[in-house]
């Protein structure tokens, strides 16, 4: 893959990840059912990808698989809470609330890995908090915007935990295999609760959820992994910071969810903090990139 093709691939992957909220809103099913269906189609897509793509690392051993299954539970929780936010507050607020996860990552790295947090990183956390304050018109638990934002922030917190767990358990492991095991964990964990919803799922929902699993998870993740073989991790991180931009743009076009000036200002602060956070990572870990399975 050439450098130009890798850039196209990573932008296409970010675009697909940005469509997750849009497809989740189009589907009439519950967030639990949507997440189960997404995992089902993602497992099928990742199985195909594992045969077509050259492995980027080793196959996970049983100890690693246990960690990946735990990561799958976090990923499943992240998906469910994200789609709840989409249903309650809309795609824009849900996407921007989730985009707060770098702030949680900064704080949790200091607590869990005892890494020194620099003053500028605390500044980025403050920037995200100000951005979140601007995204919602006012903090009122009777407001759907506020409730949806809280669900989205919880989704971002769970994703931050997932990112840190992946950092510990995916060293040297093929990224597609890691994503496959995590989606398999979601499939198994949600099956007892989502089966009734799947049985009564509207026919059109199969299309939206199938696209979520195949394109916004399986294919998007495969493009991400393939591009990492050519691009620097920092470059891909900055490009993936555009995910909320794509999500808000599609929601505006398809659902007339026109963002307010406050929301645009808050979103700009959150995205800037995300980009700055990725640029501040001084030394990349000497391991394979962790599985990237975003909303």
Name the predicted role of every residue range.
Residues 1-12, 43-70, 113-122, 140-147, ...:
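Membrane-interface interhelical linkers
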Residues 1-40, 73, 81, 141-168, ...:
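Glycine-/small-residue-enriched transmembrane alpha-helix faces in small-molecule transporters
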Residues 7, 94-100, 165-185, 217-253:
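Helix-helix packing/entry segments at the starts of transmembrane helices
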Residues 33-44, 83-114, 155, 234-252:
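Specific alpha-helical transmembrane segments that line the substrate/conduction pathway
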Residues 39, 137, 205, 215, ...:
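C-terminal-most transmembrane helix of multi-pass membrane proteins
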Residues 46, 50, 69, 75, ...:
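Hydrophobic transmembrane alpha-helices of multi-pass small-molecule transport proteins
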Residues 49-53, 101-123, 245-265:
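C-terminal transmembrane-helix exit sites in multi-pass transporters
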């Amino acid at each position: 893959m050439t450098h130009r093709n890798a850039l196209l691939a990573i932008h296409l992957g970010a675009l697909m990840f940005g469509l997750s909220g849009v497809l989740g809103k189009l589907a009439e099913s519950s967030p639990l059912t949507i997440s189960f269906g997404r995992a089902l189609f993602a497992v099928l897509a990742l199985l195909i990808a594992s045969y077509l793509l050259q492995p980027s690392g080793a196959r996970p051993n049983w100890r690693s698989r246990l960690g990946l299954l735990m990561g799958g539970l976090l990923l499943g929780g992240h998906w469910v809470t994200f789609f709840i936010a989409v249903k309650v507050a809309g795609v824009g607020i849900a996407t921007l609330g989730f985009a707060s996860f770098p702030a949680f990552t900064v704080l949790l790295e200091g607590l869990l890995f005892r890494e020194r947090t620099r003053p500028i990183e605390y500044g980025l956390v403050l920037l995200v908090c100000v951005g979140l304050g601007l995204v919602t018109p006012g903090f009122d638990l009777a407001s759907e915007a506020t409730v949806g934002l809280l669900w989205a922030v919880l989704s971002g917190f769970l994703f931050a935990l997932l990112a840190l767990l992946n950092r510990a358990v995916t060293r040297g492991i093929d990224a597609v295999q890691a994503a496959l095991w995590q989606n398999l964990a979601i499939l198994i964990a949600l099956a007892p609760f989502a089966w009734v919803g799947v049985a009564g799922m509207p026919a059109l929902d199969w299309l939206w959820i199938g696209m979520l699993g195949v394109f916004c998870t399986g294919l998007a993740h495969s493009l991400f992994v393939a591009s990492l073989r050519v691009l620097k991790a920092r470059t891909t991180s900055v490009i993936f910071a555009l995910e909320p931009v794509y999500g808000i743009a599609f929601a505006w076009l398809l659902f007339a969810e026109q963002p307010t000036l406050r929301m645009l200002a808050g979103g700009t602060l959150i995205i800037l903090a995300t980009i700055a956070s990725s640029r501040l990572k001084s030394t990349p870990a000497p391991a394979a990139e962790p599985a990237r399975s975003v909303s």
